[in-house]
C-alpha cells in the first residue's frame, strides 16, 4: 500500500475494504456510511456504482444480482474504517466550503430509470432533485471515488510493481474467497457473502486462486533453488 503514494492514496481504502469483505469494485464504491455498523462489525451491500459509457454518466444502482446482503468483518477493518471516518471529518473541516458532498438524482429515459451520481462543493446551489448520499470511499476533497479511477491505479500497480504482474481489483475478491474456504468456511456461507448466483462460481474462484498460488510457489522455488 505504501507504494501507491500520496497521489493514489484514495484507492487504498477501497482495496482494503475489498480485501476484508470480498465486495466487488462497484459495490465498494457504492458503500455508504449508513450501511456500516462499526459496533456490531457488519456492513450491508445495497448498491453498486458504474460508469455507463453509452450515457457518459456515472450511475449508482442495484448490485449485480439486485439483492441486498450482509457481510461481517473483524477488528482490523473496523480500525481502518474508524480512522477513515475521522480523516474525512478532518478534511471536511480543512476544506470548508470547497469540500464536496455527493448526490444522486433519478432520471427517466426511454421508459428506463437511472440514478446519476454527482458531487458539488459547498458554494454550489443544490438542485431540488438531488439527494445527498454519504459515501465511504472519497477523495481528499470529498468527491466520490469512482471505479474507473481505482481501475487506473490497479493497472499502475500491475505495470510497475514487481511481482504484481497479474494484479487486478477482482483478485482481492478471489483472495477473500480463497482465505475463507482454506480456513474451513462452508462453501454455501461463502457463496452468500459474495453474492454469487451459483455455488459452482464460488468453488471455481477458489480452485483458480489455489492454482495461481501453487504456480507462484513453483516459480519462487525455481528462483531459490534453480540450477543456474
PLM region descriptions:
Residues 1-31, 38-39, 67-68, 91, ...:
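Basic, Lys/Arg- and aromatic-enriched nucleic-acid-binding interface segment
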Residues 3-8, 59-68, 138-147, 160-171, ...:
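Short, contiguous acidic/charged loop-to-helix segments that flank catalytic cores in large enzymes
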Residues 16, 20-27, 149-156, 160, ...:
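C-terminal catalytic core of tyrosine-transesterase DNA break-rejoin enzymes
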Residues 35-42, 185-205:
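Short, polar N-cap/turn motifs at the start of nucleic acid-interacting alpha helices
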Residues 40, 51-53, 58-77, 82-83, ...:
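C-terminal secondary-structure termini that scaffold catalytic or DNA-interacting sites
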Residues 45, 73, 137, 154, ...:
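Hydrophobic, well-ordered secondary-structure elements that form the walls
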Residues 49, 175, 194-220:
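Catalytic-site neighborhood detector that most strongly recognizes the C-terminal catalytic loop/helix
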Residues 74-164:
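Active-site/catalytic core of tyrosine-dependent DNA strand-transfer enzymes
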Amino acid at each position: 500500500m505504501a507504494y501507491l503514494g500520496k497521489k493514489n492514496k484514495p484507492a487504498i481504502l477501497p482495496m482494503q475494504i475489498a480485501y476484508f469483505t470480498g465486495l466487488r469494485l462497484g459495490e465498494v464504491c457504492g458503500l455508504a456510511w449508513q450501511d456500516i455498523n462499526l459496533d456490531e462489525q457488519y456492513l450491508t451491500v445495497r448498491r453498486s456504482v458504474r460508469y455507463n459509457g453509452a450515457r457518459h454518466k456515472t450511475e449508482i444502482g442495484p448490485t449485480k444480482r439486485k439483492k441486498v446482503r450482509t457481510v461481517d468483518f473483524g477488528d482490523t477493518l473496523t480500525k481502518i474504517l474508524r480512522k477513515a471516518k475521522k480523516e474525512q471529518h478532518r478534511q471536511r473541516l480543512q476544506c470548508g466550503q470547497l469540500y464536496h458532498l455527493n448526490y444522486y438524482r433519478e432520471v427517466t429515459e426511454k421508459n428506463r430509470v437511472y440514478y446519476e451520481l454527482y458531487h458539488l462543493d459547498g458554494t454550489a446551489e443544490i438542485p431540488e432533485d438531488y439527494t445527498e448520499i454519504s459515501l465511504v470511499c472519497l477523495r481528499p476533497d470529498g468527491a466520490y471515488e469512482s471505479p474507473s479511477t481505482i481501475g487506473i491505479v490497479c493497472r499502475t500497480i500491475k505495470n510497475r510493481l514487481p511481482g504484481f504482474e497479474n494484479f487486478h481489483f477482482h483478485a482481492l475478491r478471489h483472495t477473500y474467497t480463497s482465505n475463507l474456504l482454506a480456513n474451513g468456511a462452508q462453501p454455501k456461507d461463502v457463496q452468500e457473502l459474495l453474492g454469487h448466483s451459483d455455488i459452482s462460481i464460488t468453488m471455481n474462484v477458489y480452485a483458480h486462486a489455489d492454482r495461481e498460488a501453487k504456480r507462484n510457489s513453483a516459480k519462487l522455488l525455481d528462483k531459490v533453488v534453480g540450477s543456474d
